[in-house]
Every structure is written in structure tokens, then in C-alpha cells.
């Protein structure tokens, strides 16, 4: 296990999803690095594939802790195939709609689940993840303005990556080993 928690009881199914989440975070670093070395549609596939895996594992963790372990497993089983397929569709025909639906529909699904379900067991901090994801997207959107306002010190795109890293740390912080 990448993550062993002595203070919060983590089920085996949640532990599997959490470990896959950590692996996908590593894959994001590799995919993003590959893309930034040679920005083109081919290398972007690897960046986006890793992102779809992160979305998958976040939604599976949410279902696991807020609905049921079985629901978490079914979410994982379905999205592990469907999520990467959204990138392959985009790569094949240029249609980014399925990927956008996964990304932004997933955010809506997280928000609705947080609002409409009770906490069944301790889990990661989904609220901070959503907030920081929104802030990261804003940083990306205002990339050039941030770069100019910072007197060419940092771009919005770079800030997006730093905020995303912070989001992961805060997301898992309720599960930390003390």
C-alpha cells in the first residue's frame, strides 16, 4: 500500500481506490511532463488519459465513502473504461464533448453527492478539492494576465499546476497518519 493509515479505518476497497489514485497522480506528472516537452495532440493524449484516471478514482472514492463500497466498486469498474474512452474519442474525431462532460459533469456529480448524501465514514476532503480545482481552472483561464500582473514571474498555467498539487495534499489530509 502507498497509504497506510493507523488512525482512520480504511476498508480494503477504499484502500485499493486510494492507491490507484496515487498512481494516477504520478501518471499525471509523467503525462503532463511529456506533453510540455513536446506540446502536440499526440502528447496531449497522455496528459488527458492520466487526468481521466484521476477523475475516475475521485468519483469512485466519493461513491465509496458517501454511498456504499459496492457503489464505489461499480463506479470504478464503469469509469475505468469509459473515462479513458473520452480521450480516445477526442483523439479519433476531435470531439472534446465526452471529455468535457466527464470533467465538468463529474464536478457537478461531486457537488450533488456532497449536498444530497450523509457522511457514512471518514473520507478525503472533496469540498476543498472542488474549490481548488475551480481556482486552478481560473488560473489557467487567466494565464497571460497572471503572467503580466506577476511581472513575468509566474504564469497562470504554472500556478494551475501548483494549485492542483496543493489540492491533492488537502484532499487526502483527513486521512493522514499521525
Question: Which residues does each PLM region occupy?
Answer:
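Multi-pass alpha-helical transmembrane bundles in non-GPCR membrane proteins
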Residues: 1-178
Amino acid at each position: 500500500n502507498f497509504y497506510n493509515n493507523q488512525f482512520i479505518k480504511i476498508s480494503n476497497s477504499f484502500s485499493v481506490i486510494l492507491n490507484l489514485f496515487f498512481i494516477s497522480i504520478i501518471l499525471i506528472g509523467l503525462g503532463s511532463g511529456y506533453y510540455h516537452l513536446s506540446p502536440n495532440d499526440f502528447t496531449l493524449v497522455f496528459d488527458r488519459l492520466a487526468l481521466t484516471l484521476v477523475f475516475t478514482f475521485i468519483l469512485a472514492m466519493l461513491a465509496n465513502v458517501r454511498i456504499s463500497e459496492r457503489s464505489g466498486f461499480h463506479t470504478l469498474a464503469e469509469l475505468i473504461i469509459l473515462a479513458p474512452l473520452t480521450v480516445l474519442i477526442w483523439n479519433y474525431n476531435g470531439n472534446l464533448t465526452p471529455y468535457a462532460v466527464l470533467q465538468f459533469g463529474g464536478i457537478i456529480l461531486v457537488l450533488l453527492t456532497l449536498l444530497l448524501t450523509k457522511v457514512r465514514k471518514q473520507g478525503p476532503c472533496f469540498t476543498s478539492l472542488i474549490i481548488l480545482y475551480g481556482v486552478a481552472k481560473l488560473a489557467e483561464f487567466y494565464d497571460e494576465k497572471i503572467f503580466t500582473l506577476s511581472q513575468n514571474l509566474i504564469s497562470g498555467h504554472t500556478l494551475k499546476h501548483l494549485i492542483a498539487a496543493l489540492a491533492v495534499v488537502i484532499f487526502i489530509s483527513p486521512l493522514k497518519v499521525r
